[in-house]
Structure formats: structure tokens, C-alpha cells
Amino acid sequence: MPFEFFSNKGNFFKGNLHGHSNYSDGKLTPEDVCNAYIEKGYDFISITDHFLKMFNYPITLPELKIKNFTIIPGAELHTSEMENGELWHLLALGLNDKFKPPDQPNFLINTKSENIENLSSRLFDAGAFVSLTHPEWNGMTLKDTLNINNAHAIEIYNHSCAIECDRGSGVAVLDQILNYGKELNIIATDDSHFHIDDAFGGWVMVKSEINSEEAILEALKNGHYYSSQGPDFKNIKVQKGRLEVLCSPVEKIIVSGYGSASICKNKTSIESAVFNLGLLPQEKWLRVTIIDNKGNKAWTNPIYDY
């Protein structure tokens, strides 16, 4: 089926979907967090403070009215427990202060807290954009993810986890999910706390007609974006068994598919490539990664119908 990734109308807006202020365990005030991202040219952010009783269940929305900058209310929610006994972490963007908190006092396991199936479903039903977070850092397994049927995305890159403990990737868990047959988009984030230099390393580029909370959330839910550490996608087309990629200058363009399937084009300062999709398992999934000469990557959301 013919497919064009960025065919919706609008412009690309740059945003961070995961970060913290001193309303939970971050260093900066919400206003200072916003100003830091504004200075780096971001168009929107969500401050996702830890939604725990010890922090009074914050949904952080600074009283800032800044032209051309959007702040999306959100939180990082927690409940017990993952297969390895770790606490669940779940992003929810577009959350309002009427959302009933789970019974989770702090970062310790609470066996009486709400299960992840119920929490993720309530968030989804409340209209939030829901994402699984840092799967490599907290040892998430495929079995864990099968408990969640109401999520939009998973972090493919978490900058804070990458620089603090070299556990910032979500690729392995993502591909297991896709191989299993579940559909899930991806996001790159900072998870910034500003105690160290953990900001401005992973973001999303969302295509939308306007930069507003409602429009950005709708575009996220519809998958009208890509994730990046630096490189940019210009366009991606699928037609008659061919995939065409247009991008900023990079060193590698990689198409990954079911199992171990992949196709790669390597060339200095390459800005386009055409791939024969007959080399990939049909009617499964594919996704595209580009890597620049600094090793920075950008990722598309998975394509399922090709």
C-alpha cells in the first residue's frame, strides 16, 4: 500500500516529553526548566514530575505564557511491580489534575498499589498520550509489556539513562514487541533532572499545523513525528515494494525489520536512499534509523502496512 510518512499538513516542532523539576527530584524550578529548553530552541516540553504521594502527586504546569512555546501537562506515574520486582514507570502527557492517583506513596514497592493494566487503561481513557519509559534501565521484558494494551509508545532512547549508566536504549525490547505482533510507536527523550548535564540529548520532531497542546497531543497519538539525537528526516515514501528515504546528511541509513532482517546503505554524507522491500519479510513491520558522522541517530516510528 502506498505510504508517505509526513504527508499531513504543518511544520515540525521540537519537543522534550520527559523531564523533571524541583516539584519532584529535579534541580530546577519549572520555570527555569522551561527557560533552559527555550534557550536551546525547543518549541514545546512536558515536565513529567514523579506522580507520588511524597511529592503531593504533582502535575507540573508552570504559569508561563510564552509566545510560540507550549507546555503540555504531564507526569511520570508509578505502580508495582515489574517481573523483576522493579517499580513501573509510565509517562502520561495531557494529564489533568482530576486524575485519581494510584496508591503509590514513594519509590518503594507497594503490593497494595494499582496494577499496571488498570493504571495504563485509566490513563488512556483519560485522553493521555501514554508511553513506557527507559526499558533497558529498569530491565523491562517482553512479558512485562504484554500486560499493557493501552500505550502509544515506548522510549527508544533515554538520554539520562544513557549518560549515567549506559542503559539508555529501547531497541531490544521494542523489536521483541514488534516481532510478537504488537504495534507501538517510539519516542526519544531526555529524562532531564539537571543535577548533571542530562538535557538536550533526545527529542521528538512533531509535524502539526499549529504548536498547541491539543494539536501536539493529537499528532503524537497519530504518529506524526520522528525521534532524534541530531539528524533529521525530510520524507519517507513506500510504494510498489520500494522505500525512499530523504534526510539530512548522514553516514548510514538502515531499514530494520522482523527478526534479524535489515538493509543498510553506507556512504559519506548521504542524503537519500532507495531500498527494495522484497529483501525484508513481508506483512510484518519495518522502521528506519539514520546515523550521522558523530554517531547521533534518528528513528522513524514503525511502519506496519507495506
Give each language-model segment a name:
Residues M1-F12, P30-D32, G181-N185, D190-Y306:
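C-terminal functional module detector
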Residues P2-F129, T133, M140, N147-N149, ...:
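A metal-dependent hydrolase metal-coordination microenvironment
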Residues H18-G19, E136, I156, D198, ...:
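Generic, low-specificity signal for short hydrophobic/alpha-helical stretches with a mild N-terminal bias
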Residues Y57-T60, K143-T145, D198-G201, T268:
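Short secondary-structure transition/capping segments
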Residues L123-F124, I177-L178, L220:
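Hydrophobic, Leu/Ile/Phe/Ala-enriched alpha-helical segments that form helix-helix packing faces
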